């Protein structure tokens, strides 16, 4: 499995738990299993700050009641490099995306844009394959790390890509400036407003994912696709047709 092992998953030294809601989605949706979140990062360096930021996000997500998986892209081929996408890393990435109900994308900003490592992962996720939609209807949180001053070029691009992949990108986002100053020697993020923003984003992602989950099929049901597939609407069973159909007046109002 190409999954990153998350060290110290329950250790949150930068989080003041006296202000943290441990299950922020309670009451927003029917009680259900933990929301499933896939996290992607955009650098293969041994001390990758996008990976370290994603690991902090995963710890917070687990504290907030989510189930997380972090994909390791270290042996992912370039798009179109392998015939018919027949590569175990590609297959595993797609399976993880299908498993997910929400995702976190975190890229370094390099030359004003996301990295090729980040883009390659997204490019390996088709809108549809054999009737399966690996990204459509999922929620998405976007993050970036920068070596210099704070910027938003990468998160803006990730938002654009999320819309292209027909995902529901949440309003909040995280951009960490001078990321090399924000992590200690052990790779843990120091307490800071940047860490607090990641906590905000993950809390919001859990809530939005819980809200969207029961309605994902309805939210991605499209006229053009029904038309192309020849799926004719049966007005006798279609709930929307029943709801807007003229209703007979009660006898007291017709007499």
Swiss-Prot record:
Its EC number is 1.-.-.-. FMN binds at residues 43-50. InterPro entries: Arsenate-R_ArsH, Flavoprotein-like_sf, FMN_Rdtase-like_dom. Keywords: Flavoprotein, FMN, NADP, Nucleotide-binding, Oxidoreductase. GO terms for molecular function: azobenzene reductase activity; FMN binding; FMN reductase (NADPH) activity; oxidoreductase activity, acting on NAD(P)H, quinone or similar compound as acceptor. Its cofactor is FMN. It is an enzyme of class 1 (oxidoreductase). Gene3D superfamilies: 3.40.50.360. The keyword Oxidoreductase applies. Has NADPH-dependent FMN reductase activity and very low azoreductase activity. No activity with NADH. Homotetramer. Belongs to the ArsH family. PANTHER family: ARSENIC RESISTANCE PROTEIN ARSH (AFU_ORTHOLOGUE AFUA_5G15030) (PTHR43590:SF1). This is NADPH-dependent FMN reductase ArsH. It comes from Shigella flexneri.
